[in-house]
Amino acid sequence: MSVLAHVLSADVEVSPLRPVTGPERPEGHQAAVLEHARSTASGLAIRVMMPGEGDDAVAHGVRDLVARVDPAVEADLLLDLGAVRADRPDAAKESLRALDALMPLMPWRTAAVLGGGFPDVTARLLEHGTAVEPRWDWLAWRELTSSTREFVRRLEYGDYGIDSTRGIARGPSSGKGGPPWGVLRYTTDESFVLMNVLTRGDDRAAAIRAVAWEILALPDFRGATAGVGEAWLRDCARGEGPRGTGNAAIWLRAGNVQHMTYVARSLQP
């Protein structure tokens, strides 16, 4: 605890970030974050993990943690749904039930619902070259925000980006080994579009550019001026030779940039 508390205290003057804790974190972590928030008046966030139907143990842990927050401290609520895909058709209803219990616990500064709907990228998913998967997380958000509950208008949206929860947990690739294929990604209103590309071989560059052209030809492509991600796809499609065709890290970055840009615009009133 003392090490974490020291790091937090040293960082408070140079960073606007708030420390995050939650009912599943060790007691020492919780205590350090609570003390930091009290002594610096910088606030904190409480992250509640809900990868499925909520349970009484989690609710009890949140209540205990909230009871230890200094009354003068501002707190943010992060309801983290984890992976939201086809096997969770009731994710919005689960969220509402959880929020019914969480929102009255204290006067939260902000409240956000987080989740990720991007599928696990596998050879089987891409065996036909292209896969189109529903944005289950976005569909759940739409259902959630259609509720007439008073607190819904205060909710903010949190997005895992255009990688699966497992992919995020694995971290970035070392660039060594791996399959002979990668993926270009694009986000439409209700779907994720994934297209298989080669990572090696004499035809690699030409094949990648051809796939980039396919994305540009999608009816839902927003145009090269929509953002940096779209501009990269255009430049990739129009280029020549291997330069500018990217690699796994660049494809993921371009995918995340176009996705987050589109999501941010979609959330504007």
Task: Give, region by region, the residue ranges found by the protein language model.
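Alpha-helix capping and helix-coil boundary motifs
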Residues: 1, 53-54, 71, 87-88, ...
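Active-site beta->alpha loop and helix N-cap motifs at the rims of alpha/beta catalytic domains
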Residues: 1-68
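Hydrophobic beta-strand segments of well-ordered beta-sheets in folded domains
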Residues: 15-19, 42-48, 72-82, 107-115
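Active-site beta-loop-alpha junctions enriched in small/polar residues
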Residues: 22-24, 49-53, 80-86, 114-121
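A short acidic (Asp/Glu
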Residues: 28-35, 56-58, 87-97, 122-129
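Short, conserved loop/helix-junction motifs that constitute active-site signature segments
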Residues: 38, 69-71, 104-106
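Ligand-binding grooves and catalytic loops that recognize ribose/phosphate and carbohydrate rings
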Residues: 54-83, 89-93
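C-terminal accessory extensions appended to soluble enzyme cores
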Residues: 92-103, 107-269
